[in-house]
Amino acid sequence: MARDERGVTAQSEDFAAWYNEVVFKAGLVDRGPAKGTMVIRPYGYRLWELLQSELDRRIKDTGHENAYFPLLIPESYLGREAEHVEGFSPELAVVTHVGGKVLEEPLVVRPTSETIIGEMMAKWISSHRDLPLLLNQWANVVRWELRPRMFLRTTEFLWQEGHTAHVDEASARRETMLALDIYHEVARELAAIPVVPGEKTPGERFAGAVATYTIEGMMRDGRALQSGTSHYMGIKFASAFDIRFTSETGREELCHTTSWGMSTRMIGGIVMTHGDDKGLVFPPRLAPHQVVIVPITRGGNVAVEGAADELAHRLRSVGVRTHVDARPHLTPGFKYNEWEMRGVPVRLELGPRDLEDGTVMMVKRLGDDGKQAVPIDSLPEAMPGVLDDFQAFLLARATAFRDGHARTVDNWTDFADAVSTGWALALHCGIAACEEEIKSLTAATPRCVPLGGEPETGVCVRCGAASAYGKRVIFGRAY
């Protein structure tokens, strides 16, 4: 198996092995003692904090408030909505004993919070004046995972989950799309992932939802990653949990509810969208370190070390997250390789000769620029623009890859070929049994009906029945 000098499997040889090696070697994550759990290390958690901060700001700017609800949920709550409990039953972790005694009612460890939040909404809502109720929670959830993969599928993960209640369907559906728009913006503008927003087919909907919307990203192996979802729940949960209000006309009515979430799975998406055989490649807007400075000294050069610290101070003063790697026991070459592995967008190399010339060597993590000698004095003012250009470069690179691996197909042979390396855009009948047959034959599933897709009708690519949805569906193998 091909490996580079860092001991990392090449993406082209085994993408799954590359991913597993990179997230560990780059210091993002470690395995937890319990099967399927992960420890997010400080470098990985800083990435999550940056994503969390930006997402939280957008959630609050649109009128939502953060709250926190219990981790343990009475088992009977899940049974109130039949589709919901059926969808989550295989993944549930249940507490049955406490202090050596059997509980009268088992407690489910939170897989998601529609039920417990629905119970509280019923207490808090009585009038149309109480609506809309716009809540968000940052929490951990547990869904027992038989085939774990760090960040992508783990037994416990971190996320935010929004839950809202509204007077009617129209306002709830607007909320559903607002959340999807937030996720689309975060993925595209911050993570530089050119996701496709769309609606899930009935067979792929969230358990208990009337409609599920998603953003789907293409990873560098051609597979899809569901990166955030938003659900219109109709009155199903309101009926199950008696979430009612008195309307302006004095009638008692059921609320329309929504739920939506984005998780630490996005970290895996960033790794798989931008990484290469050297390791991670972080988009600057979410990089824990946007710039790393490597002073090149032998035996300690006070002038060089001082200049590196001063440059770092000036970069930080203009908002650039900067780290100085002054570890004396490591060679510059080792540091270069390490920071390439860890995905830092820009490396600055500063030695005695550079200091004499008033320059520093700038190396971008990707691109054809190579090493560039740039003036130290003007670098802090120029660096935000350099980082913006790198961010745009990553988005353009990922978009070109996605578009080059997504094919419009009209027959089964082309469909099977397309999903072996990427996505197929095909007409489909919408019949669940046909979806299942496609999955069994190719491992591909309908990822979404793109919101921006052009109107089109015809016959199903598999069974030949009349097409549904009025447009093409994206099919692909997925994480």
UniProtKB/Swiss-Prot annotation:
Its EC number is 6.1.1.15. GO terms for cellular component: aminoacyl-tRNA synthetase multienzyme complex; cytoplasm. Its main location: cytoplasm. One of its GO terms (biological process) is prolyl-tRNA aminoacylation. It is found in: Cytoplasm. It is an enzyme of class 6 (ligase). One of its GO terms (molecular function) is ATP binding. Keywords: Aminoacyl-tRNA synthetase, ATP-binding, Cytoplasm, Ligase, Nucleotide-binding, Protein biosynthesis. PROSITE patterns: AA_TRNA_LIGASE_II. It catalyses: tRNA(Pro) + L-proline + ATP = L-prolyl-tRNA(Pro) + AMP + diphosphate. Consists of three domains: the N-terminal catalytic domain, the anticodon-binding domain and the C-terminal extension. Homodimer. Catalyzes the attachment of proline to tRNA(Pro) in a two-step reaction: proline is first activated by ATP to form Pro-AMP and then transferred to the acceptor end of tRNA(Pro). NCBIfam families: proS_fam_I. Belongs to the class-II aminoacyl-tRNA synthetase family. ProS type 3 subfamily. PANTHER family: BIFUNCTIONAL GLUTAMATE_PROLINE--TRNA LIGASE (PTHR43382:SF2), PROLYL-TRNA SYNTHETASE (PTHR43382). This is Proline--tRNA ligase 2. It comes from Rhodococcus jostii (strain RHA1).
